[in-house]
Amino acid sequence: MTSVLGLLKPLKKAIAAIAVLVLCIGCVQAPTISENPWQEIDLNTDSTFANIAFTDDLQHGWLVGTKETLFETTDGGKTWAERVIDLGDEKESFTGVSFSGQEGWITGRPSILLHTDDGGEHWSRIALSSQLPGAPYNITALGPNTAEMVTDLGAIYKTTDGGKNWKALVEGAVGVARTIERSADGKYVAVSARGNFYSTWSPGDTEWTPHNRNSSRRLQSMGFNGEDKLWLLARGGVVQFSDDTNPDNAEAWSEPVTPQYRNSVGLLHIGYRTPAELWAVGGSGSVVVSKDGGDTWFRDAALEEIPTNFYRVVFLNENKGFILGQQGVILRYDTSTEAA
């Protein structure tokens, strides 16, 4: 009996060691890319940036953020100059910006809508109704005098006369939203303020369609990949994609992946450089990339020491992209250096 117990002790130790090894595999960080394709730009502001857009001249763009922050570039985003629009004594935060040609729009809280038809040389303010459900969250320029605006309660409006009149596209609001994203073909996805459910809307729908989250983890944000496929980010840096085998089922999702392998780090937004290459950004300088549609991921370790959270990544095309952070920090995608 003693000899049997003596054999069991080493066996138990071996099993325990294997269990620890298995658990630690999930703690290992993702591999790193060999070269960093992002250039850090520090602007003279302590604001958090919300969005970025360019005119039909990709050298000329605008950047908006909290505290009425507005910056303009005329060299493709290499350098930026701060611009000031007199909004009186109101304390506003700009939330969205969009251009179609030289015509542009800026939204802001609590009730700001600005319009330009000369690339931003002159901005005019458009009065919004006091009955507007929620505050302007974002806007999409669609063509001459045409734009679509969404509020933080999910009310969607469209103008075809330069902002003089607006038509409601949805009868009911979705409730306070954490994030709202629009696809190129006009679909929307909104994450609830607490992250416990999400809602979708397609052109022609009269109401938003609610969907339960697919796990116990609260949702951080959702969006589209440019090809009508949804991505999802949940607490702990978890990434999922709508299931290709069920394109019409908004509740069918791929297996969850954790690119950072660090549950304490949250990812907040995804941007697609190409249909296969996507970048995810988040807290504590987190930037990760996948070049196979989201199956495998690599860290950009060169950016992890930047003392900021990254909230949004935007690609205008394969060669021009930006990551927006806080405390005046943005990153510019520089094609002179390619990621591995």
Curated annotation (Swiss-Prot):
Gene Ontology biological-process annotations: photosynthesis
Alphabetical UniProt keywords: Lipoprotein, Membrane, Palmitate, Photosynthesis, Photosystem II, Signal, Thylakoid
Residues anchoring lipid (N-palmitoyl cysteine): C27
Signal peptide range in chain numbering: 1-26
Matching InterPro entries: PSII_CF48-like_dom (IPR028203), WD40/YVTN_repeat-like_dom_sf (IPR015943), Ycf48/Hcf136 (IPR016705)
Lipidation (S-diacylglycerol cysteine): C27
Keyword Membrane among record annotations: yes
GO cellular component: photosystem II; plasma membrane-derived thylakoid membrane; thylakoid lumen
Primary residence: membrane
Disruption-associated phenotype: Deletion has no effect on PSII activity.
Record localization: Cellular thylakoid membrane
Membrane topology: Lipid-anchor
Pfam families: PSII_BNR (PF14870)
Protein role: A factor required for optimal assembly of photosystem II (PSII), acting in the early stages of PSII assembly. Also plays a role in replacement of photodamaged D1 (psbA). Assists YidC in synthesis of chlorophyll-binding proteins.
Subunit: Part of early PSII assembly complexes which includes D1 (psbA) and PsbI; not found in mature PSII. Binds to the lumenal side of PSII complexes. Interacts with YidC.
This protein's domain notes: A 7-bladed beta-propeller torus, about 55 by 55 Angstroms, with a depth of about 25 Angstroms and a central pore.
Name of this chain's protein: Photosystem II assembly lipoprotein Ycf48
Organism: Picosynechococcus sp. (strain ATCC 27264 / PCC 7002 / PR-6)
Designated gene of the protein: ycf48
